[in-house]
Amino acid sequence: MTRSSIELGDVTPHNIKQLKKLNTVVFPVSYNDKFYVDVLEAGELAKLAYYNDIVVGAVCCRIDNTENQRRLYIMTLGCLSPYRRLGIGTVMFEHIMNFAEKDGNFDSIFLHVQINNNGAIEFYKKFGFEIVDTKEQYYKRIEPADAHVLQKTLRRTAPNSNSTATSTTANSNSRSKARQFTFV
C-alpha cells in the first residue's frame, strides 16, 4: 500500500496554463488575463495543489485594504471533483491560514460563495467562517447569481507585538473528512 502525497507548489509562468485549465474545469465563471497576471505576482497567496505529483487544485488570494481594514480575500479555492474529500482543500486552506497567522496583521479572511453551494459553505463553517452578508446579482451569466460573503474574523495583533492571530484549526479527523467544493 502506498501513501498519498499532497503538496503545494508555486504558480509560475511555466505552469500558469495548468491553473487556467484547472479553473476552467472547476469554476462556473471564467477569469480574465489580468487575474492570471496578478496571480503570478501573488507569491505565497497563489498555490497549485498536487496529489501524487498531479495538479488537482489551486488556491488564489489577494490582500484587500478597503473599509479601513486589512483583509485576506480568497479569490478561488477549488479541487477537481475526483480528488475531493481527500484533504486537499484543507491543506490549501491551512496554507492560507498559516500565512495570515504568520503575518499577524489581518483583520479577517473573506470570500464569496454562490448561495446554493452548500458544500463550500459547510467547509468554511468548519474553520470558523460565518455568513456576514449576501450580495444580490453578484455573478454574471450563472444562476443563482447571488453570493454569500463568508468571513472569519482574526484578532489583529497590536504593533510591535510578538503574538499571532488566533484561529480555529482543523483537528486530525477533519482533514480526512474535509470536503472541498468549487466556488468563486
From Swiss-Prot:
It catalyses: N-terminal L-methionyl-L-alanyl-[protein] + acetyl-CoA = N-terminal N(alpha)-acetyl-L-methionyl-L-alanyl-[protein] + CoA + H(+); N-terminal L-methionyl-L-seryl-[protein] + acetyl-CoA = N-terminal N(alpha)-acetyl-L-methionyl-L-seryl-[protein] + CoA + H(+); N-terminal L-methionyl-L-valyl-[protein] + acetyl-CoA = N-terminal N(alpha)-acetyl-L-methionyl-L-valyl-[protein] + CoA + H(+); N-terminal L-methionyl-L-threonyl-[protein] + acetyl-CoA = N-terminal N(alpha)-acetyl-L-methionyl-L-threonyl-[protein] + CoA + H(+). SUPFAM superfamilies: Acyl-CoA N-acyltransferases (Nat). Its EC number is 2.3.1.258, 2.3.1.-. Acetyl-CoA binds at L77, G78, C79, L80, S81, P82, Y83, R84, R85, L86, G87, I88, G89, T90. InterPro entries: Acyl_CoA_acyltransferase, GNAT_dom, N-term/lysine_N-AcTrnsfr. The modification N6-acetyllysine is found at K47. Keywords: Acetylation, Acyltransferase, Cell cycle, Cytoplasm, Transferase. Its main location: cytoplasm. Disruption phenotype: Flies display disrupt centromeric sister chromatid cohesion very early in division. This failure of sister chromatid cohesion does not require separase and is correlated with a failure of the cohesin component Scc1 to accumulate in centromeric regions. In contrast, no mitotic defects are observed in germ line cells during oogenesis. (Microbial infection) After infection with E.chaffeensis, results in reduced bacterial replication rate and increased survival. RNAi-mediated knockdown in the whole organism, in the fat body or hemocytes results in a similar phenotype to the genetic knockout. However, knockdown in the eye, salivary gland or wing has no effect. One of its GO terms (biological process) is N-terminal protein amino acid acetylation. CoA binds at N117, N118, G119, A120, I121, E122, F123, Y124, K125, K126. PROSITE patterns: GNAT (PS51186). Residues 138-141 are annotated as: Substrate. Autoacetylated. Residues 157-176 are annotated as: Disordered. GO terms for molecular function: N-acetyltransferase activity; protein N-terminal-methionine acetyltransferase activity; protein-N-terminal amino-acid acetyltransferase activity. Component of an acetyltransferase complex, at least composed of san, Ard1 and Nat1. Belongs to the acetyltransferase family. This is Probable N-acetyltransferase san. The lineage of its organism: Eukaryota, Metazoa, Ecdysozoa, Arthropoda, Hexapoda.
